[in-house]
Amino acid sequence: MLVDKLYALSLSHKRLSVDELSEISRNVHKTCYNVQAFVFHTCNRVEVYLYDADAGPAEHIKRSYGPYVEKVAEFRGVEAARHLFRVAAGLESMLIGETDVLGQLEEAYESQVRRGNLRGLLKTVVERAVAVGKRVRTETGISRGPRGLGSLSIVYLSRRLPLREISVCVIGAGAVGRGVVKELIDAGVRRVAVVNRTVEKAADLGVEVRPLTSENVEWCLREFDVVYTAVSSFEPVVVYVPPGSRVKLVVDLGVPRNTAPNLPVEVVTLDHLRELAEEFNRQRAEEVSKAEKIVEEEVARLEEVLRRRWVELEMSALLKKWFAVAEEEGERAGGGPARLAAMSTVKRTLLPLVNYIKEVAVKDLAVAEGLLQVLKSAYA
């Protein structure tokens, strides 16, 4: 089975603290930078997914988890797919059903496709995971209440400070930061501002926006009661607090942590939110079984999806060549209508053949492999 070639490594909030996860994230990213792999790193997990990888590279990546390598969970085949689908569905999150993880998954997918690290059938697996996450949140009520760790932190904040009387600055306007800003506004916070690397990306939020500089980080600390950090950075964003600053609380949602140790102000991290998350997890217990049923349905379908995609990938080079030949012959015959007719003939002849081989692959992968080999030998 094609899904059998999938392999995953995972360390999450279930085995390590946020600070410990932050320790290993840089090394894992560095190890995987030029590798065909999908790295999914949030404040609650550091995971790597590989497809059809040799044992040597896989073991090398596993060792990049450093002092925590013995705590790494390994998943293979269907279990690896099931784990990724559960992560996308929010079933493995500290706050069950949270939506931030889905946005982060999409961001990781897009960036790694652009970089060229994610392609082939591994890309298809991640695409299916995103689709599963969306389906779970559409068909169940698992995300009712706080929709993410950002919104959970606002509940925490509301139990500490009067929201309508405070000012909040959010550093970072990615998926998590944007969600926090919108919920702060909805909660009636007196003043909200954003500091972000690109001002344009946060312009639509309808609040004051400044570029991410050390001066503007200081401005946040001096002028606001609460500062959120939600930046993807391997270096701390808040390294010191200027004397006389107004800030009472820093909420660090960064990946990894955005705050330097031993700051002279209270820093709230995700570890502080565990008890509150459990409170809402108990309320969502009934929806968990519905979400798990959807995950199992999608896991059962994955092999068929992979086989169809495998045929497309195997045939793509041949199709490209055949279309090029048809275009060339059409130009020789006078171009224009002749070229279009030649291209149309290729489509009418070959696309049904591709679809036929897809159906064969679903039933018998070995037979489909034989058909593809015949085509490659005859026409390559």
Curated annotation (Swiss-Prot):
InterPro entries: 4pyrrol_synth_GluRdtase, 4pyrrol_synth_GluRdtase_N, GluRdtase_CS, GluRdtase_N_sf, NAD(P)-bd_dom_sf, Shikm_DH/Glu-tRNA_Rdtase. The active site is at C43. One of its GO terms (molecular function) is glutamyl-tRNA reductase activity. One of its GO terms (biological process) is protoporphyrinogen IX biosynthetic process from glutamate. PROSITE patterns: GLUTR. It comes from the Archaea. It catalyses: (S)-4-amino-5-oxopentanoate + tRNA(Glu) + NADP(+) = L-glutamyl-tRNA(Glu) + NADPH + H(+). Keywords: NADP, Oxidoreductase, Porphyrin biosynthesis. The keyword Thylakoid does not apply. The record marks H83 as: Important for activity. It is an enzyme of class 1 (oxidoreductase). Substrate binds at T42, C43, N44, R45, S93, E98, T99, D100, Q104. Signal peptide: none annotated. The keyword NADP applies. Disulfide bonds: none annotated. NADP(+) binds at G172, A173, G174, A175, V176, G177. It holds the Pfam family Shikimate_DH. Its EC number is 1.2.1.70. Catalyzes the NADPH-dependent reduction of glutamyl-tRNA(Glu) to glutamate 1-semialdehyde (GSA). Possesses an unusual extended V-shaped dimeric structure with each monomer consisting of three distinct domains arranged along a curved 'spinal' alpha-helix. The N-terminal catalytic domain specifically recognizes the glutamate moiety of the substrate. The second domain is the NADPH-binding domain, and the third C-terminal domain is responsible for dimerization. Belongs to the glutamyl-tRNA reductase family. HAMAP family: Glu_tRNA_reductase. During catalysis, the active site Cys acts as a nucleophile attacking the alpha-carbonyl group of tRNA-bound glutamate with the formation of a thioester intermediate between enzyme and glutamate, and the concomitant release of tRNA(Glu). The thioester intermediate is finally reduced by direct hydride transfer from NADPH, to form the product GSA. This is Glutamyl-tRNA reductase 1. The gene is hemA1.
